[in-house]
Amino acid sequence: MEDQASAQLLGPVEIRQLAEKLDVTPTKKLGQNFVHDPNTVRMIVSAADLNSDDHVIEVGPGLGSLTLALLDTAQKVTAVEIDPRLAQQLPLTVAERAGQFADRLNLIHKDALTVAPDDIDHPTALVANLPYNVSVPVLLHLLQIFPTIRRVLVMVQAEVADRLAADPGNKVYGVPSVKASFYGNVRRAGSIGKNVFWPAPKIESGLVRIDVFDPEHQPWPVTDDMRKAVFPLIDSAFAQRRKTLRAALSGHFGSGPAAEEALRTAGIDPILRGEKLDIADFVRLARVTAAQEQA
């Protein structure tokens, strides 16, 4: 790979020209903000720690800023784009600016939330400037259906980045924080200013990195069965976050006393609130619940 010329990345002028050619105006409905700074794109790819054998999913490639840099590095890039004009243009942009890597691009014209396991073959990484309005649902959906993903590096709104990487007890700790940590170790990986986007958003963005648990060293089984047992507990615990766990989980367990019994068996104080529990606590509670149901 090293003996091939690098892709020609897009700058502000090229982004505007492409948008004008396609009669594309970034829409709030689709959460579109196009990155037009090559240095930011290079930084994102570097922070993702990609290897030459990686198969990367990119959601919302837009005009191709990040796509071109990913093609430079990865073995294969599957770009998922919902906008028909952008989906039609992306292969043309790649052919023009990174023709030597064109065979590495796989394009799916689809809503990322409807992507199915059979749509993408063994992806190993997710690197994307996620559409702001669906960033968390898309992230969790792809982690759920593609257990082969080992690394995630996504750009999201700063407040979403803070939420995803928050620890128990933090005021922004909540459902996204706990569910993301079911799959791996989550951390903030940098901040992105407004001026690298067109149009410039009103708030800053942040990078979030997830190092997905190694299948041979998972702290709990990262399986569909475990997810289905754990995630409803998380949802119930945070549905009314000011309630104690005993009260918040009473509906899930059928009564307050039943919830308290399960919590105490799991070694969790029933008067705590959900925001004090980490993912390991919820997994332990799910296991207690499963054991009670089998008894």
Swiss-Prot record:
It comes from Corynebacterium diphtheriae (strain ATCC 700971 / NCTC 13129 / Biotype gravis). It is an enzyme of class 2 (transferase). This is Ribosomal RNA small subunit methyltransferase A. It comes from the Bacteria. Belongs to the class I-like SAM-binding methyltransferase superfamily. rRNA adenine N(6)-methyltransferase family. RsmA subfamily. Specifically dimethylates two adjacent adenosines (A1518 and A1519) in the loop of a conserved hairpin near the 3'-end of 16S rRNA in the 30S particle. May play a critical role in biogenesis of 30S subunits. One of its GO terms (molecular function) is 16S rRNA (adenine(1518)-N(6)/adenine(1519)-N(6))-dimethyltransferase activity. HAMAP family: 16SrRNA_methyltr_A. It is found in: Cytoplasm. S-adenosyl-L-methionine binds at N33, V35, G60, E81, D111, N129. Keywords: Cytoplasm, Methyltransferase, RNA-binding, rRNA processing, S-adenosyl-L-methionine, Transferase. Pfam families: RrnaAD (PF00398). It catalyses: adenosine(1518)/adenosine(1519) in 16S rRNA + 4 S-adenosyl-L-methionine = N(6)-dimethyladenosine(1518)/N(6)-dimethyladenosine(1519) in 16S rRNA + 4 S-adenosyl-L-homocysteine + 4 H(+). InterPro entries: KsgA/Erm, rRNA_Ade_diMease-like_C, rRNA_Ade_Mease_Trfase_CS, rRNA_Ade_methylase_Trfase_N, rRNA_adenine_dimethylase, SAM-dependent_MTases_sf. GO terms for cellular component: cytosol.
